[in-house]
Amino acid sequence: AYTRFMLQVATDTTVAVKADVPTLTKQVQANGSQNYTAATEYRIGQSIPFQITATLPSNYADFPLYKFTIKDTIPVGMTYNNDVRVYLQEGGTEKDISTFFPISYTGNVITITPGDLKYVQGVKVSSKIVIRYTARLNDDAVMGALGNPNIANLTYSNNPNGNNSSTAETPDTKANVYTYQLKVNKVKENQEALAGAGFTLYKKVNNQYTEIKKFKAGSDSTFDFKGLDSGDYKLVESTIPSG
């Protein structure tokens, strides 16, 4: 990044120029909480709130034009709900400024940009730009330790000295969503597969068990309960096969 400065000296002088840059932080709302964090767990079918927070450089006022483009890549295991909203946080208040930010969604990438941030009313060097949206965890979600990372970065103007085409990018910032799988094998006493069973999985929510998923009796002897978050579960054999 560049800094605009004016300096007049009469003798040899050493000057340290501060090259300030904006920051970008991607977070996901913790399951069952209003707090945002770097990683959490959800079940398939749940809508997941995400938040992106951008700060501005200390020399923001020096820019005649300020390019500001956020790209957010959603993994294949999530379905975007087309509900992005953009907010201006300043002095303890929050204002919806979504009308200044055209949104596009192509190839799992959300692009959020006003073109020139200077056209957005009320933005100051102390402001934060906050973006929120939701995405639903779908059947293509990755199970286990790899998670389903959601990645964002910011392209921004980095030279206030007249070169409007000069830009840089923030490092990628990531929020990860984990989901899990439970596999049940129904067998006879001799460990042979036994078809015809039916199972219902319950999760404890607010001290009560709520039905999550049911497998009806059939020819299967193996049951996969995919896309589970952490918590207390109860598995009930709802259909008992003969044998």
Regions found by a protein language model. Give the residues of each.
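Solvent-exposed loop/turn and edge beta-strand elements of beta-rich ligand-binding domains
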Residues: 1-243
